[in-house]
Amino acid sequence: MKKAVNVETNNFDTSLKEQILAVKNAGFQGVFFDWADTEEFKEIVEFTRATGLEIASIHAPFDHVCDMWNEEKPEIFHKLIKCINDCGSLNIKTLVCHVYIGFDTVAKVTDIGIKNFSLLIDEAEKYDLNLAFENTEGVECLYGIKEHLSHRKNCGFCIDTGHEFCYNAGYDLLKDFCDKLFFLHINDNMGVTGDRVFWTDDSHIIPFKHGKVNWQRFTSNLKSINWNSWISLELCVKNKPNKHTHDDLIGVPCEAFYNMAFEAAKRIEGNVND
């Protein structure tokens, strides 16, 4: 299986290009990063491909994405359309999208929301671009997408292991979404550490370190669904506010970080293949 990892502008005090080269040198075959409505985004895509790395996916913007369930074509809708157009024109194959954001509101599936997301899929189909809808808080809306839209060829899902652990306890998302699983965000965390579910627990730790995700269960589940696509890690290198999950990475250069990440990816692959 091919292996990929994310790069982010705020992960290190180095450029995205330097991080991408470190990813390549660590042994990964692919990389993924956020879309931006800039010429630099297109330049980074071209640079990545010139190194020989594949663009495993791109991450769509998700600010105010909960408005998709309450308004007809809200501002975020138009931003997502622009993102789809850019990715399609650059021959990106997979775009990861959130369907909800917010910890102080109740997720509710609505007709207008299904219509908005259906229109996004319409646009993606023009480019044969796969939309991989990701589990976050408000997982009820993800199940709404599955119920109403998963019959569409370009509608599928991205399962984030860390989100499942700290946001979606009690769900078996790989089992529920395996029929249309397009991508993975593999990462670890400490679970819910406070008195409520909150984004600061979404640590994105390298697997097999000090997080609490059950990796034996995860790799067993991957094996059971015959997963043979990307082993893709979505990681952070810095602490969330008032957290200390990444203290061990303070001062670690990006080359060493991506070497550690690649070893974790190989271990996951090995466990799946056992």
Model regions: which residues?
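Aromatic/hydrophobic pocket-lining residues that form π-stacking "cages" and hydrophobic walls in ligand
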Residues: 19, 44, 83, 120, ...
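Alpha-helix-loop-beta-strand connector modules within alpha/beta enzyme cores
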Residues: 47-63, 114-127, 213-220
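Acidic-and-aromatic substrate-binding clefts and catalytic sites of carbohydrate-active enzymes
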Residues: 10-15, 30-43, 64-74, 102-106, ...
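Active-site acidic/histidine proton-transfer and metal-coordination neighborhood
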Residues: 49, 69-157, 166
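Alpha-helical scaffolding within the catalytic cores
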Residues: 39-43, 79, 169-172, 217
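A cross-domain feature marking catalytic cores of carbohydrate-active enzymes
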Residues: 7-9, 33-37, 57-62, 97-99, ...
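Histidine-acidic metal/acid-base catalytic patches
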Residues: 1-4, 9, 13-24, 92, ...
